[in-house]
């Protein structure tokens, strides 16, 4: 041991998990192959499931780290961070899509107009259900905002999961019991 090595501060433990980048890459490839309508890539929708599982894992890990550091989950701060992270990108995509449709495809703009608010407010999945629209059976030219269904589901997860996790943490359940409850909720 050199004196410099002994004096160097310990590096904080990284929250970054490189293997998850590999999973993300596989998920992206699966989704892209699915959308290319390749007969041998029918399982590509599994990529969306991978994204959902990764998001659930990472958000749970983030919230449990907060509990370990502070002893609580600050729901308001969590939701504000999600809004600050996602809303600018969502608004940008919707505005740019509207602008491009206005310039290049006015018919598509008319078609997507009812999808704008559900996309901006993260209930596009419920909107599609109410309109009897099947994302998976969409023929012809679906709305360019149709894909927002998956982001809507993720945002709804962000609304529901943190309070449930907070309730479990507040009940001081043992790890085995917590695992059983989480698996039960996941099954639902």
Regions found by a protein language model. Give the residues of each.
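Membrane-interface helix/loop caps of multi-pass membrane proteins
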Residues: 1-188
